[in-house]
């Protein structure tokens, strides 16, 4: 009986649908909708930066074995087209950001040229759109599981609705003139737009280029002029730049914000819901009276 157990377990896993999500936050959303019917792999893991990710042959194998792939798009995964081509995958691919209103901004390095902010998940309203797209994608790829995906999505959307009210109430306790902070890269524009906060960053929407001395000097002048109370680290970036800016301006160093990746399982942001709660907790701790 014992000898047969591993084979049974293996059969059970083989019957699951192999799904690839491009990064850890998306992997968690997919996992909540797919539940026990799917096996999810995130290409870019916890505390890792999707902007500068370099795929390996092992990642191509993951795509080749997948039945379904979920991508964020909006310019986040610049490496994905080459990886899909190299893998020869026949998986169905779904763009989870379909239907959101993209945030456009001036490209500081190319004046007159706009870039799209890919970090749409930082607004819970957008995360709900992601969940609906994941539900529909899984239902299309696996019609027998449609009712399961619909039930899972409905339950998870209710949790996101409660989370959104929680976030709005917490940010509402921060005085309006304190709702301005500095983060390493411009990952929180959707959060700021949704919940009434201003995030200023020495780096643009991607972390793939170091800010120039001129960019940093501009930020330092802005902090002094606007009396911005706090600067925050991100889990995916080198903290030294923020430490330098804080030292030169006297701004308080807030906690670590989770922007493009979850924490590992032992950290405070191991799921999307935990990530949003952790970020709000750090913001209110540093900014609320």
Positions of the model-derived regions?
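Extracytoplasmic metal-acquisition and chelation regions
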Residues: 9-289
């Amino acid at each position: 009986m014992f000898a047969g157990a591993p084979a049974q377990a293996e059969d059970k896993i083989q019957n699951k649908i192999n799904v690839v999500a491009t990064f850890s936050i998306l992997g968690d959303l997919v996992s909540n909708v797919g539940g026990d019917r799917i096996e999810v792999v995130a290409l870019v893991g916890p505390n890792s930066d999707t902007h500068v990710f370099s795929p390996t042959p092992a990642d191509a194998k993951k795509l080749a074995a997948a039945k379904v792939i979920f991508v964020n798009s909006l310019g986040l995964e610049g490496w994905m087209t080459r990886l899909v081509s190299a893998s020869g995958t026949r998986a169905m691919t779904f763009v989870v950001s379909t239907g959101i209103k993209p945030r456009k901004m001036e490209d500081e390095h190319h004046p007159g040229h706009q870039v799209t902010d890919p970090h749409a998940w930082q607004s819970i309203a957008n995360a709900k759109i992601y969940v609906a797209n994941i539900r529909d994608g899984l239902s299309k790829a696996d019609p027998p599981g449609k009712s399961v995906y619909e039930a899972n999505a409905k339950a998870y959307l209710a949790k996101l609705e409660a989370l959104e009210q929680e976030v709005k109430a917490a940010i509402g306790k921060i005085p309006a003139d304190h709702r301005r902070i500095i983060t390493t890269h411009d990952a929180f524009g959707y959060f700021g737009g949704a919940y009434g906060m201003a995030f200023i960053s020495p780096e643009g929407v991607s972390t793939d280029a170091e800010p120039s001395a001129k960019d940093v000097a501009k930020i330092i002048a802005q902090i002094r002029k606007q009396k911005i109370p706090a600067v925050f680290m991100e889990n995916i970036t080198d903290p030294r730049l923020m430490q330098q800016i804080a030292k030169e301006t006297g701004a308080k160093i807030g906690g670590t914000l989770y922007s493009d990746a979850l924490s590992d399982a032992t950290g405070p942001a191991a799921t999307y819901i935990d990530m949003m709660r952790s970020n709000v907790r750090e913001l209110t701790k540093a900014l609320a009276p």
